């Protein structure tokens, strides 16, 4: 199984709280993969640039990417994005642009999106998601 970690879950994991996130990671099977979207990676880098300790933040991100692979765009992401951006707009229920890209990246891989931002992501009915904070 591929598990794509949303930005909030990555931050929880880096801070080791809530501890249940690390516990869930430790319970994964050997063939399970932890990944993050390039969008999540960009959000982390943006946060590092805005932090008071840039070098420490960048080092923490580098260590994280040794365990969680960063995945980059493909054509399928764009197809899902086009579909869901229009579907949600027509429903009058759009979500944040970065969240939409992350969701579409997970859809393109048939991955389970791990997030605490359930309110936004549950609008995308094709998306598999789990909240590991519960």
UniProtKB/Swiss-Prot annotation:
Pfam family, one: PIN
Domain PINc, residue spans: 3-132
Outcome reported for the amino acid change (mutating residue 115 to A/I): Loss of toxicity
Annotated consequence of substituting residue 101 to C: Loss of toxicity
Enzyme's top EC category: hydrolase
Functional note: Toxic component of a type II toxin-antitoxin (TA) system. Acts as an RNase. Its toxic effect is neutralized by cognate antitoxin VapB1 but not by non-cognate antitoxin VapB2.
Family, as annotated: Belongs to the PINc/VapC protein family.
PANTHER family: RIBONUCLEASE VAPC2 (PTHR33653:SF1)
Protein name: Ribonuclease VapC1
Native species: Haemophilus influenzae (strain 86-028NP)
């Amino acid at each position: 199984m591929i598990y794509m970690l949303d930005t909030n879950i990555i931050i929880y994991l880096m801070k080791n709280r809530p501890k249940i996130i690390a516990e869930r990671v430790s319970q994964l099977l050997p063939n399970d993969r932890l990944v993050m979207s390039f969008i999540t990676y960009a959000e982390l880098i943006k946060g590092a640039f805005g932090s008071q300790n840039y070098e420490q933040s960048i080092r923490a991100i580098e260590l994280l990417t040794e365990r969680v692979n960063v995945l980059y765009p493909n054509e399928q992401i764009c197809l899902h994005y086009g579909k869901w951006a229009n579907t949600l707009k027509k429903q009058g229920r759009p979500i944040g642009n970065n969240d939409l890209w992350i969701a579409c990246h997970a859809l393109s891989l048939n991955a389970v999106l791990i997030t605490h931002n359930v309110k936004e992501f549950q609008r995308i009915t094709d998306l598999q998601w789990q909240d590991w904070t519960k």
